[in-house]
Amino acid sequence: MPQLNPAPWFMIFMFTWAIFLTILPPKVMAHTFPNEPSPQGMTTPKTAPWNWPWH
Amino acid sequence: MTLSLFDQFSSPSFLGIPMILMALALPWLLIPTPTSRWLSNRVVSLQGWFIARFTNQLFLPLNVGGHKWAPLLASLMMFLLTLNMLGLMPYIFTPTTQLSLNLGLAVPLWLATVLIGMRNQPTHALGHFLPEGTPTALIPILIIIETISLFIRPLALGVRLTANLTAGHLLIHLISSAVFVLMPMMPAVAILTAVLLLLLTMLEVAVAMIQAYVFILLLSLYLQENV
């Protein structure tokens, strides 16, 4: 099984953690949520249609 | 040289450059970083909702001290989920089939949970070695068994992900080869095998998502025991 060849193991280990620690957390943490979590039991407001584009 | 079925898993290199660096660095183009706009687009909104709901669900059973792991486990979920799902497409290398990657993630994270438990609440952490209500005569053997099961955890975590993905890719390879070989000889059997391949591919999509989730879930359980 070629996965058991230990030659690239250290490089893969280092690079995985480098990507996992530098690229991903900024992407995940950049998501912001504008509203506070609301308690359940509130009536859902009726939504009005909007005429401006999605983005 | 003739290729064996396992050669699809050898860490690819081109002109001496290991291609796994590409496989690890490029998928994040599919996860756009949200800007400071109040109104985001569909992709960003969906990813944000997924991350928020997932992290909420995952951290419900954890004490507040463990909540500082939220960014790490959310990032790890996106990491594994993206790599697993992308690898299902033809000719795309799946880095999570590499035992080095999975053990490299599992061992440090498991060790972190164990060290946190041993440092902050050593009595409580060591108490996991002896379940309540054990008959006195069984205590020595049970402590040995619990110790072994503790140390097996990172190995199981890494090997579970590796084996599931490797086996899935191997099966897809085998069955698709069978479809091609059977097509000129027995077209009816080839069509049945193609239906089987379709079902298997749907299973592999599910396995890709579930195995990523199981990895994270087990890490959160190990954290729950220790924090």
From Swiss-Prot, chain A:
GO CC annotations, alphabetized: mitochondrial membrane; proton-transporting ATP synthase complex
Bilayer-spanning residue ranges: 4-24
InterPro entries to which the protein is assigned, alphabetical: ATP8_metazoa, ATPase_protein_8
Region (Disordered): 34-55
Cited Pfam families: ATP-synt_8
Domain of life: Eukaryota
GO biological-process terms attached to the record: proton motive force-driven ATP synthesis
Main location: mitochondrion
Keyword set, alphabetical order: ATP synthesis, CF(0), Hydrogen ion transport, Ion transport, Membrane, Mitochondrion, Transmembrane, Transmembrane helix, Transport
Assigned protein family: Belongs to the ATPase protein 8 family.
Function field: Subunit 8, of the mitochondrial membrane ATP synthase complex (F(1)F(0) ATP synthase or Complex V) that produces ATP from ADP in the presence of a proton gradient across the membrane which is generated by electron transport complexes of the respiratory chain. ATP synthase complex consist of a soluble F(1) head domain - the catalytic core - and a membrane F(1) domain - the membrane proton channel. These two domains are linked by a central stalk rotating inside the F(1) region and a stationary peripheral stalk.
Protein name: ATP synthase F(0) complex subunit 8
Organism: Gadus morhua
Species classification: Eukaryota, Metazoa, Chordata, Craniata, Vertebrata
